[in-house]
Every structure is written in structure tokens, then in C-alpha cells.
Amino acid sequence: MSKIRVAVIGAGGKMGTRTSRNLAAMPEKYELYCVEAAPKAAESVMARGLALYSAEQALAAAQVVIFAVPDTLIKKLSAIYVPMLQPGTGFLILDPAAAVARELSLREDCTFGVAHPCHPSFLKDQDTPEARADRFGGEGGHQDTVMSKIQGDDAVFALMQQTAKDMYRADNAFVMTSEQIAFLEPTLVELLGATCLYAMAETVDKAMEKGIPKEAAVSFLCGHIYNLTSNFLGYLEGRPPVSDACKVAIGLGNKMVLRDDWKRIWEDEVLAQVIHTMLHPDAEDAIRVELPDNPAIPIR
């Protein structure tokens, strides 16, 4: 069986490093062409023992292209790289925002898709110390990936699916539309999930102000998150009901913590506004937001 020829554009960035490292670990299956323009990032690629190629060399050879560049640069950079593709190439971006916003350059003779990692879940059987220590995925932790075919050939997309599963070390590749992936991220895991989790982390700070040791607050919070998440999502056998007092507390939290109309985040026009603001935060019609600034909590 011949090897799959894969080009990774941005191979020295965060996602480019993770994906190229995993594909490079399967030399019997993949012929890898790493492209990196930033000097320091290029040095990191070579330090891992991988060869660097020009974009022209890589795209002339590649069957599948992994476009590991920042979301905010996809519009600009895809306009440069997509015209260089060979007919029949599969082109994968790693986030749906630019596709949903129609900022990704396309070609009729190529196949385009999205592949985004789910990250290792505490509901999966993370059965080794390495798996349990892997927070991002691809380094021992069991995770899945979500994918969409924006346009193109089914056979090429099947090749892209296999490549995505290998580069993320994913157990499953769940295929859906790009819009559905966008409702997963940003809507589900960032607009709601990350916001709530950020508030929980800030609440640990408040617990410490009350004299509660951080270790106790974190253990108490994370244990309850595991228990309640498992229960509410149907992964706790028998789905035992929470206490009446907890039900009252949830009702109070809905009034004191969440906006009454928070489920509007699942409306199409809200998603469009959110994606536009995330890709173009300085645009005149972007939603004005106050960024979180707690120095104890890292924000990329």
C-alpha cells in the first residue's frame, strides 16, 4: 500500500506541532511535508528531526493538506495557498469558523473539510497514567474528532478522515456539517462551557478569600463536576436524582448566574455574530466585549 502524502502548513505552531508529530510517528503510512515560515517555529520543526519544504514543493506532492494556521489568518492565507493546490487535493482546516463565515478560499477541483479534536474526556476510559495526564489529546489520551466535508469528492474525504483520525489519535471521527461543528465550538464549549468553567475557577479564588484551602476547593469542585456531569448526561447508572436542595440551588443559579435568555446562543444569527466578532474583534460591527483578565487563569 502506498503512503499518504501529507503537507502540514504551519508545522511549527501549536496545532501544527501536535499533528505533524503524530503523523511523523507513522512513517510506514505517511510521507510528511512540513512547511513553516516563522524562523523560530521552523527551528523547532527541524529540532524534532523533520525536514522542511517550501510551500511549492509540499503542495506539488501532497494528497492531503493540513492547514494549521490561526483562524484569523485563514482568509488571507488560504487565498495564497489554495491556488497552489494540485487538482484532487484534500484541504483540511482545523476550525469551522472561517468556513461558516465563508472566508475560506475554495476550488471546484479540490476537496475541503474541517477536522477539530474533542480532547480527552473524563467519561472515556483513560486507562494509563500517560492517558490521564494528556489534557489536549494525541499523546496517549483517548479522544474523538468532529469533521465536516465542505465540498468535494467522497473518496478524497475518506482519505482526509483517516488522516485526521491519525493526526489526532482519535477513536472516532463524527461527521456533521461545518455549521454543526460551529455550534459545538464556539457555542457549546466556549460561549457557554468555557465561560462557566472560567467562572468556576474565579469562584475558587473567592473560596480562598473565605479561608478555604485551594486544594480543598479544587477537589470539591472537580469531584462534583465529574459526578454531576456524569449524572446529567446519562452516564451515571440509574441516573439517581439530585437532592431537593440541589434542585432549589439550580433554580436559584438560573436566576442569579445565568441570563434568562441565554439559550439564544443557539440561534443562527447569534452564531454568525459571535464568529464574526471572534475572527474580526476590531471590526466596527463586532460585539464589544470585556476580556477576562484574572492573572491567575491563563487565557491564550
Residue map of PLM features:
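C-terminal alpha-helical interaction appendages
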Residues: 194-208, 227-233
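Rossmann-fold dinucleotide-binding core
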Residues: 94-185
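A short glycine-threonine-serine/GTX helix/turn-capping micro-motif
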Residues: 185-194
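NAD(P)+-binding Rossmann beta1-loop-alpha1 motif at the extreme N-terminus of oxidoreductases
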Residues: 1-49
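Short acidic-hydrophobic, aromatic-tinged amphipathic segments that line or gate anion-handling sites
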Residues: 51-56, 175
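NAD(P)-dependent Rossmann-like dehydrogenase/reductase catalytic/cofactor-binding core
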Residues: 212-300
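Rossmann-fold NAD(P) dinucleotide-binding segment
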Residues: 56-106
